């Protein structure tokens, strides 16, 4: 994928490594599902047509989030400068680091857990995911949503906010894949 800047390549590798860390952990893999633009681009649209800079997760079951947040902090301990923000319906971990490739710039990673929407319509699936480069090699199965359900959340997002990326994501997915409109 032709990213515009070296730090975007670094951030994309950090996202991939974080996903492997999260979903290689049996506890977290049973508690969290991966969704959002990053899920759509990493799992269903290849090559990635757009840069995505965060990890959106959903708490699978309605239960206290404290132990999940604690474990998430443990498995992401390779990332520096963690700030945790807890709200009623979502919990966020923010990480800040400097890029390794000059010129040095700030890279941030946001990992957000939606603690409100515990349902899914089409059932969760596990999709193999791997990273293989000189910086990090690892693999896991990501717990996520089926393509049509991810597209449904993108369609809903069009009604809730005005961000061109949602329309772009829908366009790319609909032109690259056969989808069932009734499921969306």
Cite the ranges covered by each PLM segment.
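Short, conserved acidic/polar surface loops in the N-terminal third of protein domains
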Residues: 44-48, 68-71, 107-109, 123-125
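Generic non-transmembrane alpha-helical segments
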Residues: 18-28, 71, 75-79
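Catalytic cores of NTP-dependent nucleotidyl/adenyl transfer enzymes across multiple folds
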Residues: 2, 6, 16-20, 27, ...
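Metal-dependent nucleotidyltransferase catalytic core
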Residues: 59-93
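Active-site nucleotide-donor binding segment shared across nucleotidyl transfer reactions
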Residues: 23-55, 59-60
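Catalytic micro-motifs at enzyme active sites that drive phosphoryl/nucleotidyl and oxygen chemistry
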Residues: 45-47, 82-86, 96-102
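Hydrophobic (often cysteine-bearing) scaffold residues that line and stabilize catalytic clefts
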Residues: 7, 11, 68
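Short N-terminal amphipathic alpha-helix/helix-capping patch enriched in small hydrophobics
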Residues: 11-18, 36
